[in-house]
Structures are given as C-alpha cells and as structure tokens.
C-alpha cells in the first residue's frame, strides 16, 4: 500500500503523536 504524507500525519495526530512521515512506504509517527 502506498503511504501518503498527509494521511500519515492525520493518523499519527489522531493517535496522540505530534506528526508522522512516510519512510519506506510505511507511516512512521513521532512525538
């Protein structure tokens, strides 16, 4: 599955992280 930066950020924020980005086509969240 493709990783979209905007979707990733939204998902991460919804889980309580400050943001997220795509690395190797996976969404990675960070504090």
Curated annotation (Swiss-Prot):
Major subcellular site: secreted
UniProt GO MF annotations: potassium channel inhibitor activity; toxin activity
GO cellular component, one term: extracellular region
GO biological process entries: envenomation resulting in negative regulation of voltage-gated potassium channel activity in another organism
Site (Basic residue of the functional dyad): residue numbering on this chain: 21
Keyword list, A-Z: Disulfide bond, Ion channel impairing toxin, Neurotoxin, Potassium channel impairing toxin, Secreted, Toxin, Voltage-gated potassium channel impairing toxin
Site (Aromatic residue of the functional dyad): 30
Disulfide bond annotation, renumbered to this chain: 3-22, 8-27, 12-29
Keyword set includes Secreted: yes
Keyword hit for DNA-binding: no
Recorded coiled-coil stretches: none
Tissues showing expression: Expressed by the venom gland.
Location within or outside the cell: Secreted
InterPro entries named among the record's database cross-references: Scorpion_toxin-like_sf (IPR036574), Scorpion_toxinS_K_inh (IPR001947)
Protein family (similarity comment): Belongs to the short scorpion toxin superfamily. Potassium channel inhibitor family. Alpha-KTx 19 subfamily.
Notes concerning its domains: Has the structural arrangement of an alpha-helix connected to antiparallel beta-sheets by disulfide bonds (CS-alpha/beta).
Quaternary structure and partners: Monomer.
Something else known: Negative results: does not block voltage-gated potassium channels rKv1.4/KCNA4 and rKv2.1/KCNB1.
Protein purpose: Blocks voltage-gated potassium channels rKv1.1/KCNA1, rKv1.2/KCNA2, hKv1.3/KCNA3, rKv1.6/KCNA6 (IC(50)=75.9 nM) and, to a lesser extent, Shaker IR (with the inactivation domain removed).
Protein name in the entry: Potassium channel toxin alpha-KTx 19.2
């Amino acid at each position: 599955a493709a990783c979209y930066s905007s979707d990733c950020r939204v998902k991460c924020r919804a889980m309580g992280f400050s943001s997220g980005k795509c690395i190797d086509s996976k969404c990675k969240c960070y504090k």
